[in-house]
Every structure is written in C-alpha cells, then in structure tokens.
C-alpha cells in the first residue's frame, strides 16, 4: 500500500515528500517515531490535491504547524503527516486588517504587525510555532486569545476551500472545532491602529515575562496541561511536590512546573509516563483532574 501511495504522491504532489521520517525532527519535544510520509505541499492548490489523494485512498493523516504543542508516540504515525510550512502569505489589507498564511511563524507575524502599526496580537510574540497551530488551539497569553482577533479563517478539505467568519466558529479556551478532513491554511485578522513604538513596548514586555518565567533551557512543548477553571496547572503540580520529578529523560521543569522538558535521550513513553504520574498526584492532592493541552497522536 505504501509503495502505491508513494507513487501517486510523487506523480501528483509538487511539494516535498519524505518517507519514514522521524517525527522527533519535527516536534519541539524532540521525540516521536517515524511517519510513513511527511509531506509539505507547495501551495494551497497542492494541499487540495494531496487531500483528494488521501480521501480517495482512505489514508489517515495529521496536519502539523511548527511541531509545538504536539507529542507523537514512539511507534510513529501510520499515514501522512502534512506540514503547512509553505503557507507563508502575509499581507496588510484595508481597514486595519491583515491576511496571514498558516505557515507564518508567530514571531514573524508580530514583527510585521508592529512595523505596520497594527496592534492586538502582541502576546503571540512569546508563543512559539506558527499561526496555523495557534489558530487550531486558540492560543493565548496575557489575557488575549488569537481567535478573538479573527475576522475569518480559510480552510481546505476534500470539498475545496471555505471561508468561515468568526461568528460561525465553535471555539473556546485552547479549543477550536474543525470538521473532519479540514485544515486551516490562513486567516484574516482585524486589528487596532497604534504607534509602532507602543506596540514594541508591549512586545518587549511579553518577551521579558516569558524569559523570566518560562525560559526552561531544554526542549519542551510549552504548557503541557490546560489550566483548570480558576486554577493554575503549574501551581497544582508544584503543590503535589513534583517540581523536578523525572521519568527517564523527561522531567518536570525546575523553572516552570507546567513545562515538561527533554533532558536528553527522552522517549515519548517517558513523557506519557511522567504525565500520568502528574495527573495521578494532582488528583490525589487537590481532587482536580488535569487535562493535557499537548495533543497526542501515533502508535505505541
């Protein structure tokens, strides 16, 4: 099956196609077994052609951005991992709006908006990864969330391209519901006009906060658990006595207890075992059930 699929991909997809690609190369945790295929479509039309092939052949697939907020199990992913890395359009529109491709890095977007005097997404400067990944999880910080600034998102599926206004989206805290077979390829944002110097000051403040509280020094996926309503996950983990707790090469950060870090040689199984230990300890100590913010895929 893989050889037949490979032949079709090579014949009909213009982007880069890698076989048996270790996902540890494409995730910020630096763990994860091989994907059968790792495909980076050349543009949105190429993405549509790829999705048509996968639908026709019944091939499982997974869309990724910058590989943050993602854990692939050690057995890898049986199917196709799709990267949006080449969806990098970035343009200012009339009316303090900007249209942004899913593959644009969050830091690049905040720098562009600052230079254009457009405010409202400064908090993204401290969130690693891409705009597509940020949209898919409704990323946020410092009281802001990315979908609050969206006018519409552009998605692609087997039926083609679709624009969805924010009022039609089902979203919430670290959550956006997408339809099966649907991938975000871009979004239009509505922003505020402001002096670039004031925007820079806010960006600097966000970066300073991140450096002081989240500069953990080892590969990580950012916050591993969601904050329960009215509570901070890091505090619950701290109170359970787990600062510095370790399973194999995976460790609860000494700097920020909601960050699990790869101290070297970690496996996905190490992170999963450590996460299970944390959930059990927090439940026992506080009665609170933690839920992973990191998305987990793949085979054991």
Swiss-Prot record:
GO terms for biological process, alphabetical: cell division; cell wall organization; peptidoglycan biosynthetic process; regulation of cell shape
> What enzyme class is recorded for this protein?
oxidoreductase
Mind telling me which GO cellular component terms the entry cites? cytosol
Catalyses which reaction(s): UDP-N-acetyl-alpha-D-muramate + NADP(+) = UDP-N-acetyl-3-O-(1-carboxyvinyl)-alpha-D-glucosamine + NADPH + H(+)
Q: Where in the cell is it found?
A: Cytoplasm
Q: In the UniProt record, does the keyword Cell cycle occur? A: yes
Q: Any idea which GO molecular function terms this record carries?
A: FAD binding; flavin adenine dinucleotide binding; UDP-N-acetylmuramate dehydrogenase activity
In this protein, which residues make up the domain named FAD-binding PCMH-type?
30-194
Tell me its cofactors. Answer: FAD
Keyword Coiled coil included in the entry's annotation: no
- The protein here is known as UDP-N-acetylenolpyruvoylglucosamine reductase
Species this chain originates from: Geobacter sulfurreducens (strain ATCC 51573 / DSM 12127 / PCA)
Gene of origin?
murB
């Amino acid at each position: 099956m893989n050889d037949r699929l490979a032949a079709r991909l090579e014949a009909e997809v213009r982007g880069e196609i890698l076989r048996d690609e270790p996902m540890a190369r494409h995730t910020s945790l630096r763990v994860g077994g091989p994907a059968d295929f790792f495909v980076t479509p050349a543009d949105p039309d190429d993405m549509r052609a790829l999705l048509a092939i996968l639908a026709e052949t019944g091939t499982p697939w997974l869309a990724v951005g910058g590989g943050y907020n993602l854990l692939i199990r050690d057995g890898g992913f049986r199917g196709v991992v799709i990267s949006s890395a080449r969806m990098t359009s970035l343009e200012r529109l009339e009316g303090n709006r900007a249209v942004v491709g899913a593959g644009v890095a969050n830091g690049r977007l905040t720098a562009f908006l600052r230079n254009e005097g457009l405010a409202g997404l400064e908090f993204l400067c401290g969130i690693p990864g891409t705009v597509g990944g940020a949209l898919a999880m409704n990323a946020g910080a410092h009281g802001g969330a990315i979908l609050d600034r969206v006018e519409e998102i552009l998605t692609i599926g087997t039926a083609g391209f679709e624009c969805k206004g924010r009022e039609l989206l089902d979203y919430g805290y670290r959550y956006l519901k997408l339809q099966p077979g649907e991938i975000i390829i871009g979004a239009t944002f509505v922003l505020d006009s402001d002096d670039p110097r004031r925007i820079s000051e806010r960006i600097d403040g966000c970066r300073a906060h991140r450096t002081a509280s989240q500069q953990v020094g080892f590969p990580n996926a950012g916050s591993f658990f969601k904050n329960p309503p009215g509570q901070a996950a890091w505090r619950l983990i701290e109170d359970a006595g787990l600062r510095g707790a370790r399973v194999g090469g995976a460790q609860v950060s000494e700097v920020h207890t909601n960050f699990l870090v790869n101290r070297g040689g970690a496996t996905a199984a190490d992170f999963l075992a450590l996460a299970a230990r944390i959930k059990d300890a927090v439940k026992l100590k506080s009665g609170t059930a933690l839920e992973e913010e990191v998305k987990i895929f793949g085979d054991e």
